[in-house]
Each structure stands twice: as structure tokens, then as C-alpha cells.
């Protein structure tokens, strides 16, 4: 089990519940919870933790993944890269509640947003993994389509 997470995330021990269902070409991209106990706004496009089985990946994944973490949009871009390489991607954040513990308030500005191919990943439970209604939706987000984040995704 390999876990990549932002440095301001406190991992939930329930993350280990994913170990028995890890499989080749499966990526968990988990939305965070804020310190107040609420899931982050727009959980389908806000992930801070990625989990996969240790495995060889296609070289194109390695080349495309050389993007800086912490930029707005990097999480959906990273998940899309794995999805395009044949990975199934799920966001079981309704069972695993990783908490965002930030020492200083930061504002994500669109000037620093990573535009392009994104993967919107609906929130689900561990038991929902594999169900069609929780499959992610790949989209292309050009710079002029910022309203997609405000409109939301209904699944």
C-alpha cells in the first residue's frame, strides 16, 4: 500500500480498511474533511490523499505526474493521469475521514490553477467501490470554464 498525501493532512486510521481491497490498476483519491468535521466543499474535485498498490506503472504516468502538488487542480489532474492509463479511481471519503489541519489560512487563486484534463470523482463508501454510479467523470477544464466548479457535479 502506497500513500501520497499533502503535508497538512492527518490520516484517518480507517485508511487501512482499504488494504484488503487494493488491486492492480486501482487508485483511491480521497477528499478531505475540514477541522470542523465537515467534508470539504466540492468533494468530487478536492482530494489530498492518493492510495494505490505498489506496482509498476506506465512510463507516461511517471512523465505526466511531474506536476507540483498544492496547486489548485493538481489533485484532479493527477487522478486523471492514472484514469487515462487504465486505473479505476474511487473516492471512499464517506468512510475515511482524513482531516485538513492547516496552520494558516490560504486562498487558492485561479492564476495558479492547473487547467486541462480533470477527473471528477464522486464521494462514496468503501462498499460502493465498483458500482457504476460512483465511477469518475473525465472532463476537460479550459481556463474560461471556471464556472464548472461553482455549478457542481451531480454524479
Question: What are these model-predicted stretches?
Answer:
Residues 68-155:
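C-terminal catalytic/acceptor-binding lobe
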Residues 9-84:
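Conserved catalytic core of nucleotide-sugar-dependent glycosyltransferases
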Residues 2:
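Short aromatic/hydrophobic "clamp" motif used to bind/position activated sugar donors
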